[in-house]
Amino acid sequence: MDRGSPRGFTVIETMLFLAVSGLLIMGILIGSGGAINAQRYKDATNSLLSYFQSQYDRAANVQNLRDTDLGCATGGTELTVSDTAISRGTTDCVIIGRLLVASDSGESISARTVYASSDLSNSFSESGAQLGGDVEVIKNSGLFIDDDLGESRDYAPEWNTRLVQAGTSDPDAWQILIIRSPASSSIRTYISDDTGLSLVDLVDASNEGQRLICLDSRGLVMSGNRGVVFSAGSTGGSGVKLVGDGQC
């Protein structure tokens, strides 16, 4: 019995198949794109955390990267260029910490070396005991940075993210001083929203509180911003931790 030729797909059936297939493919692409962006934002926040923690390591374990023709005198406020080579560790100044300053746009952080130039012999008794507290010793240590000859490096948050104030999209500008006491070697952290504050004025108990630093995803994710938090009185990298959605 002749059953006729096999029946193919109609135009409508073909169009429906293509439409459904297109929607499925689009959904897969959107889903994978969202997952990729979420991972990028996670990487950006983890990178920011690692950056801050590395600055504590730089303050505790000094890296003297200066050129051998740079020197410094007791009581000085800048590095000087010498005609002869000066061995590292033989000048009258010491590297004492790191100063981090966020740009007004929130798109970069500059890190500079902090030096101390004062003779601290009066900070100790004849028996070697420390006289006065760390804050007093730090304030009297002749703090300075040298924008011309000192080390300065910039860090930009990854994937076009930027630093913003908590709960807003406004850029967040601040300065963070991570400093090692030249007397006790204890690490202290001072944070201020006033980027024009001098180093001496920055060393104040009012600047040792907890500080939240948020990272704007700039559309990478639709959930809330994430960031890091400096614990009050942070003395090391462990005092900086990640914070999740809802805290920024």
Language-model-detected regions and their locations in the chain:
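N-terminal single-pass transmembrane signal-anchor helix
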Residues: D2-Y41, T45
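Aromatic-residue hotspot detector
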Residues: F9, T77-L79, L163
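Generic hydrophobic segment detector
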Residues: E13, G22, I36-Q39, S87-G133
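Localized chelating/binding microdomains
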Residues: L16, M26, L49, G75-T84, ...
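Membrane-proximal N-terminal amphipathic helix
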Residues: I36-L70
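Short, glycine/small-hydrophobic-rich surface segments
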Residues: A59-G106
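Intrinsically disordered, low-complexity regions enriched in Pro/Ser/Thr/Gly and acidic residues
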Residues: D104-C248
